[in-house]
Curated annotation (Swiss-Prot):
Name of this protein: Phosphatidylserine decarboxylase proenzyme
Cellular compartment(s): Cell membrane
Alphabetized InterPro entries for the sequence: PS_Dcarbxylase, PSD-A
GO molecular function terms noted in the UniProt entry: phosphatidylserine decarboxylase activity
Family note: Belongs to the phosphatidylserine decarboxylase family. PSD-A subfamily.
PANTHER family found in the cross-reference section: ARCHAETIDYLSERINE DECARBOXYLASE PROENZYME-RELATED (PTHR35809:SF1)
Species: Wolbachia sp. subsp. Drosophila simulans (strain wRi)
Topology term for the membrane: Peripheral membrane protein
Modification Pyruvic acid (Ser) occurs at: 186
Active site: 186
Chain's gene name: psd
Swiss-Prot/TrEMBL site (Cleavage (non-hydrolytic)) positions: 185-186
Pathways involved: Phospholipid metabolism; phosphatidylethanolamine biosynthesis; phosphatidylethanolamine from CDP-diacylglycerol: step 2/2
Annotated S-S bridges: none
Length: 230
């Protein structure tokens, strides 16, 4: 935060600048018109806010990649590689983001980006669980140990038709780091190994980079945590 203003994600700069200019022009025409145009400017500023987070510093913890509400948890088979058709069992944790949530996405666990793919699809409302299978999405595979991966999906919604992912193959990433954003309401799925201890439940509100989704080592549940502010 600087000068009392909230941190703003750079993806929102153009929206906010245009809205601000329109608002200034509107005020020059009439006070009432200016006040009316001020509302979307404030709304854009609020939507693209990017607050710092206290990230738990523990390599065994899988953190929430997004703010929102857990809409579904289920065990699934996921095709890990398009080349050989390999499938593995994962636990899917699906997070719905409303337009009021912070939409900046964060890395759930430290590791290396092993695979990335962008899949075209529909723009079903993100409130529907159908969006996980039918909608346009960015798929990210993170290898946290040799041969062990988790998968993150950024999913577009009815309004959110712009997925931003600032990652590359073989890039080293750290838990809690910002890696992208989905504009105006969306869904983020995270697939964790099926034998992992899931620490959240359906209907629970989660915070990106802070809420613990799962623990890779059940013996470390009571371990004292330290935090990095990112």
């Amino acid at each position: 935060m600087c000068f009392g203003l909230p941190n703003i994600n750079r993806e929102g700069y153009s929206f906010i600048v245009v809205s601000f200019i329109v608002t200034c022009i509107a005020f020059s025409i009439s006070w009432g018109f200016g006040v009316t145009c001020l509302f979307p400017t404030l709304l854009c500023t609020y939507f693209f806010r990017d607050p710092a987070r206290a990230v738990p510093n523990n390599k065994n913890l899988i953190l929430s990649p997004a703010d929102g509400v857990i809409s579904k948890i289920e065990e699934v088979n996921y095709p890990l590689s398009a080349e050989n058709g390999e499938e593995k069992k994962f636990t899917l944790v699906s997070i719905f983001l409303s337009v009021l949530n912070v939409h900046v996405n964060r890395i759930p666990i430290s590791g290396t980006i092993k695979e990335m793919s962008y899949k075209k699809g529909k723009f079903v409302s993100a409130m529907s669980n159908r969006s996980s299978n039918e909608n346009e999405k960015q798929v990210i595979v993170i290898e946290y140990e040799k041969g062990k991966e988790i998968i993150v999906e950024q999913i577009a919604g009815l309004i959110a038709r712009r997925i931003v992912c600032n990652l590359g193959i073989s890039q080293n990433v750290k838990a809690g780091e910002r890696f992208g954003i989905i504009r105006f309401g969306s869904r983020v799925n995270i697939y964790v190994p099926a034998d992992t201890e899931v620490r959240v439940s359906e209907g629970q509100t989660v915070i990106g980079g802070e809420t613990i989704i799962a623990n890779l080592n059940k013996e470390n549940v009571q371990e004292k945590l330290t935090f990095d502010v990112i």
